[in-house]
Amino acid sequence: MVEYKQCIIIRDDLKLSKGKLAVQVAHAAVSAAEWASRSDLENWKEGGQKKVVLRVEKLQDLFELKEKARREGLSTALITDAGLTEIAPGTVTVLGIGPARADYIDKVTGNLKLV
């Protein structure tokens, strides 16, 4: 059976509080899933909706991952914060990729560290 998953990648340089980080990750998970193909979304749901949260050092890393994911045909969602609490308005916080086949996502995120 083919495994499906979703990855959410956070920026380590922002040093967000746990609560703020949880909200940003949730935004990315929902938004990226909305862009996924119907078949990827259904397969992911049937497989338990696996999610993996990873990290990068800085904003440029998120942009590079988004471009790599686009080239692989993966759905993505780059999340920008409204700036009402901890960080400046318009700050890009996280990137959601997938859901999609795990082997496709691993081509893009396989070298990243877990949060």
UniProtKB/Swiss-Prot annotation:
PANTHER family xrefs: PEPTIDYL-TRNA HYDROLASE 2, PEPTIDYL-TRNA HYDROLASE 2, MITOCHONDRIAL
Matches recorded under InterPro entries: Pep_tRNA_hydro_II_dom_sf, Pept_tRNA_hydro_arch, PTH2
Catalytic function, reaction form: an N-acyl-L-alpha-aminoacyl-tRNA + H2O = an N-acyl-L-amino acid + a tRNA + H(+)
Task performed by this protein: The natural substrate for this enzyme may be peptidyl-tRNAs which drop off the ribosome during protein synthesis.
UniProt keyword Cytoplasm, yes or no: yes
NCBIfam families: arch_pth2, PRK04322.1
One Gene Ontology CC term in the entry: cytosol
MF terms in GO: peptidyl-tRNA hydrolase activity
Primary location group: cytoplasm
Gene3D superfamilies referenced in this protein's UniProt entry, alphabetically: Bit1
Upper classification of the organism: Archaea, Methanobacteriati, Methanobacteriota, Stenosarchaea group, Methanomicrobia
Family: Belongs to the PTH2 family.
A biological process from GO: translation
Enzyme class per UniProt: hydrolase
Protein name: Peptidyl-tRNA hydrolase
Pfam families per UniProt: PTH2 (PF01981)
Record's subcellular location: Cytoplasm
UniProt source species: Methanococcoides burtonii (strain DSM 6242 / NBRC 107633 / OCM 468 / ACE-M)
Keyword Protein biosynthesis: no
Domain of life the protein comes from: Archaea
EC number: 3.1.1.29
Key words, A-Z: Cytoplasm, Hydrolase
